Amino acid sequence: LSLDLPDKDYEWMQLSGAWSRERYIKNRTLEQGITAIDSMRGNSSHEHNPFLALKRHNTDENAGEAIGISLVYSGNFRMQAEVDTHDVTRITAGINPEGFDWKLEPGESFQTPEAVLVYSENGLNGMSQTFQKLYAKRLARGYWRDKARPILNNNWEATYFDFTEERLVEIARKAKECGVELFVLDDGWFGARRNDRAGLGDWVANEELLPNGIKGLSERIEALGLKFGLWFEPEMVNKDSDLYRAHPDWILQTPGRNTSHGRYQYVLDFTRKEVVDHIYGMMAKLLSESKISYIKWDMNRSITECYSNKLPSDRQGEVFHRYILGVYDLYERLTNEFPEILFESCASGGGRFDPGMLYYAPQGWTSDDTDAIERLKIQYGTSMV
């Protein structure tokens, strides 16, 4: 998007923060020069949401002019306003140009992410209502778009990695007594996952913990009158996993350099179709065999060493964008095959809380901060778009 405005008499508003402090409202007055937000993390990020608003100095919740711009994209982005020597303001929004190249052969085309532009004469409330109505009816889609969402209980903060099948069933039983409708099993149910150092990428049940497998556990949960949900982190892998031992070249890594990890995990190369196909196959098999009504899709680290062994050196500038296209492809295939499963997007809380995700997952994890008072600023900022 590129938009010119004839003056600079605006306040810039952005939604910024950090983990557990996502989307705090930040305001500043536009002056000559460049005001910008961006992400180079491989996701839209906790630090800056891909949204900005320009509002007149007298604009409040219900009166005054406001212009909102929201980027429908989940990867690296940049949004900026530049005031020139004539006090003309130019707004641009799109893929972050830093580190980005895309090679086009003759006859080929490239599709850029879409941006949504909203103009309001009825203040910030008029702007936010327009965004929300548009996204609720024209961007979100599928079986769950217009349905009330189930009240859920997630075991993570009750057990972390320390659970057994019997303990999970007991938690679910008590949750049912409290009016909960959906029980969600979080991290730790798969492979050799007894802590965060192993197992990612091996999406098969740990039979020592779950002797009846996910199928058996899901049936026991449903017998209590609850629906059953499951946590995945499809884009990541631990070195201590069968997947990594079989395919050490399937991660993003720069040749000749040490590959850094976050939470002891590495990023799978989702630019490669065979990698996405493999993860899809494991997830689809499990979803087909078990009574699963909900998926929490997590992403717990940023992308570093963004280099694909599959692409030639003159196409490495495409990796970040190709990666997020791979994520979208996996979402598209799973949501098409399992249309009645409720997908919730998550990235260490609200690290990928953007309209691009909303198209595939009609529910988003707002933040890992569940303190009622601390959430007030997060909820207020989130309500803007």
Can you annotate each of these PLM segments?
Residues 1-82, 98-100:
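Polysaccharide-binding surfaces and accessory modules of carbohydrate-active proteins
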Residues 81, 95, 122-124:
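Conserved mixed alpha/beta catalytic, RNA-binding, or beta-rich assembly cores of soluble enzyme
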Residues 85-105, 340:
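Short acidic, Pro/Gly- and aromatic-enriched capping/linker segments at domain boundaries
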Residues 102-121:
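Short Pro-Gly-centered flexible turn/kink motifs
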Residues 118-150:
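Terminal connector regions
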Residues 144-281, 294:
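Aromatic-lined carbohydrate-binding/catalytic grooves of carbohydrate-active enzymes
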Residues 160, 191, 206, 212, ...:
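Active-site and adjacent substrate-binding regions of carbohydrate-active enzymes
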Residues 238-277, 321-385:
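Glycan-recognition surfaces
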